[in-house]
Amino acid sequence: MSHTDLTPCTRVLASSGTVPIAEELLARVLEPYSCKGCRYLIDAQYSATEDSVLAYGNFTIGESAYIRSTGHFNAVELILCFNQLAYSAFAPAVLNEEIRVLRGWSIDDYCQHQLSSMLIRKASSRFRKPLNPQKFSARLLCRDLQVIERTWRYLKVPCVIEFWDENGGAASGEIELAALNIP
């Protein structure tokens, strides 16, 4: 999936409408970040089909969790924000049994496997114009989910994400996830 694929597919999913993700669910899923003082996702909305998830999120990075402020959004923060939006978007899809291959998981199963069983297999990022870390947004699209039957059975999750701010700051990434221990 390439960056150019994001907009047409997003229009199709968005036409079905996204719904807000409840703060209670965000708090539960983002607890591993909150406990370290690096929850950057303020709020999010999502929609899902049997093999795709679309999400929008608003972020703020008041203080970087790992370094003094660089004054701009960087690669480490891109991955942290991607993780937060992806974890948050898949949680209600699991809860509502919208993704066929994950229908055997409860929300408790999802949270139990969230950190230990969801891996980044590949990642690339692109920074077009410096992004203000104080206030920015993102759009995430994961589609064409596929169960891979190898030594380790896993769910391949190809994703693209775009970040922007109100001053024209822009960054994007292509990330492939592997979800292990799937039902």
UniProtKB/Swiss-Prot annotation:
GO terms for biological process: fatty acid biosynthetic process. The gene is fcoT. Gene3D superfamilies: Rv0098, thioesterase-like hot dog domain. This is (2E)-enoyl-[ACP] glycyltransferase. Its EC number is 4.3.2.11, 3.1.2.-, 3.1.2.2. One of its GO terms (molecular function) is lyase activity. GO terms for cellular component: plasma membrane. It catalyses: a (3R)-3-[(carboxymethyl)amino]fatty acid + holo-[ACP] + H(+) = a (2E)-enoyl-[ACP] + glycine + H2O; (3R)-3-[(carboxylmethyl)amino]decanoate + holo-[ACP] + H(+) = (2E)-decenoyl-[ACP] + glycine + H2O; a fatty acyl-CoA + H2O = a fatty acid + CoA + H(+); hexadecanoyl-CoA + H2O = hexadecanoate + CoA + H(+).
